[in-house]
Design a protein with these regions (language model features):
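Active-site loops and adjacent core secondary-structure elements that bind or stabilize anionic groups
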Residues: 1-182
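Single conserved hydrophobic/aromatic residue that forms the stacking wall/gate
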Residues: 180-190
Length: 190
């Protein structure tokens, strides 16, 4: 039944996107992307699905380095991604998230300056956090970020020099992700 329900949902969504009417009902379809080691807590199970309505976001990110993301990493990474998308992509901006809460957000003349300002907002909570940058990570930014333990870094790209700096931290996860898109919906289920 899940196969036909998936197919029907795709058809419904196509008609909905191509209509000016507001529907009373909304259906969604997704494909299993990965089964996670555990859910929010170790005794819970969790899975990650890719939505038929989106082509960007954490499920579509490329993991360049590090181990598989956990459920909590995904939640925090998504919070960081949503926050950083609120800022102008032309102005270097960095957001640091811990337990789904911002502990630093700043813009600057350079990405390195933006990171330094964001980190200075709460140097304690930033430890083990998720960092989202709205521009390609450069060598100077990487040299600053590497100074503290970080779980995940999300950015639209990374230079070869920055990659080399991060390689010394094998558990650091680096996600390359489209930040500014016009996907049809943002879907969540708790």
């Amino acid at each position: 039944f899940s196969t036909t329900a998936y197919y029907d949902s795709l058809i419904s969504n196509w008609f909905q996107r191509n209509s000016n009417d507001t529907s009373e009902k909304f259906s969604t379809a997704g494909k299993l992307s990965s089964t996670l080691r555990y859910g929010e807590n170790p005794h819970q199970s969790a899975s990650l699905y890719k939505s038929s309505l989106q082509q960007s976001g954490i499920p579509y990110a490329t993991l360049l380095q590090g181990k598989e993301l956990s459920y909590n990493n995904i939640n925090d990474a998504d919070a960081a991604l949503q926050l950083i998308k609120e800022f102008d992509k032309e102005i270097p901006t960095v957001a640091i998230i811990k337990h789904a809460n911002p502990c630093g957000v700043a813009s600057g003349a350079s990405l390195c300056e933006a990171y330094t300002k964001a980190f200075s907002c709460d140097t304690t909570s930033a430890f083990g956090g998720i960092i989202a940058l709205n521009q390609i990570i450069d060598k100077d930014s990487a040299a600053e970020i590497i100074k503290i333990f970080t779980e995940v870094i999300i950015a639209p790209g990374i230079t070869d020099e920055a990659k080399e700096i991060f390689e010394s931290k094998s558990n650091l996860r680096i996600l390359i992700c489209l930040l500014y898109t016009s996907d049809a919906a943002d879907e969540r289920q708790s």
